[in-house]
Amino acid sequence: MPMERFLKDFTIPEKIEFLKSQDDGSYGKFTIYPFERGFGVTIGNTLRRVLLSSIEGYAITAMRVQSNNKDSSSKVVSSEFDLIPGVSEDTLEVIANIKNIHLKLREGEQRKTISFSVSGKDTNVLKASHFERDGVEVFNKDLVIATLSHDVNLDFEFQINYGRGYVSSEQNSKYLEEVNVIALDSIFSPIEKVSYSVEDTRVGQRSDYDKLVMEIWTTGVISAKDAIKKAASIVREFLFPLVDFEDSVSVSFDKSKSESSNLLDMSIEKLDLSVRSLNCLAKENVRTLGELISKNAEELSKARNFGKKSLEEIIEKLGSYQLFLGMSKEDALSVLSKNVKISE
């Protein structure tokens, strides 16, 4: 039976009602109907799982804390089990509070390091609002991070990254080069809670159709409306290859061509470069593989804080994919079309 005729026998949802009760869009209630019986649960459960697991967001992945004393001496907190001088809470509690900060970077930025100092003479409480810098927006500004004594002076440095799901401190520590930097567990998901229910609804003479009611709560980093759109797009992308799977030969051939082109738009973060190299490239507005290979070694060497070690690392990483600095786009596409597996 042709696909078009097959779908005509199904009742497809025609109405989506959206209720927003928060000014920032962090809560949304969606009523979608009508579905054929059983499809409400299928679609609702699928969207819920994708929303909770696969929506990307921002998290603090590492921190460095230094205490400055009156006698000009200083102490750097070496691990999560070391105490922060002048702070009432232990370091583990401070870290737990930091992981609850809801923030995001400026559009297009995926990595940023922020630094600031706090004196107990100015404030006795470190709050999430202290993390708000140029290019960093914080959504729960009143969250208390730590309680400070009057004579404490602290210097903080934090690494903010863009990602998905949960990343352990062990994984984050692989990208740290400096000593006395504490890697943190990171929860990138901006989704706080998702619930759904299925009710009966009437279509014509039949009252056994499904009405799907979904409620989404976010941290404010993304609106509930954008979150459900993104989740639906993710599901669609995963199911799309199954639609024409009988044409696997031609699909595979086309995919090889298009995927090699798409790889030039791949984020340089997927090259597993060191934090230092990534930061230097970001300052030069190099964010994709295509932008990286368009640069030559001389251009990169002139970048501030870009050393020989970083250059050697980049050359080695590109070489593992048979690419090199100063390579033309045409040559790169030719190489990548024969080796599209590097995106997997």
Swiss-Prot record:
Entry's Gene Ontology cellular component terms: cytoplasm; DNA-directed RNA polymerase complex
Region (Alpha N-terminal domain (alpha-NTD)): 1-246
One GO term (biological process): DNA-templated transcription
Superkingdom, natural source: Bacteria
Region ranges (Alpha C-terminal domain (alpha-CTD)): 259-344
Catalytic activity entry: RNA(n) + a ribonucleoside 5'-triphosphate = RNA(n+1) + diphosphate
InterPro entries per the UniProt record, alphabetical: DNA-dir_RNA_pol_insert (IPR011262), DNA-dir_RNA_pol_RpoA/D/Rpb3 (IPR011263), DNA-dir_RpoA (IPR011773), RBP11-like (IPR036603), RNAP_asu_C (IPR011260), RNApol_insert_sf (IPR036643)
EC number: 2.7.7.6
Pfam families: RNA_pol_A_bac, RNA_pol_A_CTD, RNA_pol_L
Gene3D superfamilies, alphabetized: 5' to 3' exonuclease, C-terminal subdomain, DNA-directed RNA polymerase, insert domain, RNA polymerase, RBP11-like subunit
The keyword Nucleotidyltransferase appears for this protein: yes
An example Gene Ontology molecular-function term: protein dimerization activity
The entry's keywords: DNA-directed RNA polymerase, Nucleotidyltransferase, Transcription, Transferase
TM stretches of this protein: none
Assembly information from the UniProt record: Homodimer. The RNAP catalytic core consists of 2 alpha, 1 beta, 1 beta' and 1 omega subunit. When a sigma factor is associated with the core the holoenzyme is formed, which can initiate transcription.
NCBIfam families (UniProt xref): PRK05182.1-2, PRK05182.2-5, rpoA
Role played: DNA-dependent RNA polymerase catalyzes the transcription of DNA into RNA using the four ribonucleoside triphosphates as substrates.
Protein family membership: Belongs to the RNA polymerase alpha chain family.
Domain notes from UniProt: The N-terminal domain is essential for RNAP assembly and basal transcription, whereas the C-terminal domain is involved in interaction with transcriptional regulators and with upstream promoter elements.
Record-given protein name: DNA-directed RNA polymerase subunit alpha
Gene: rpoA
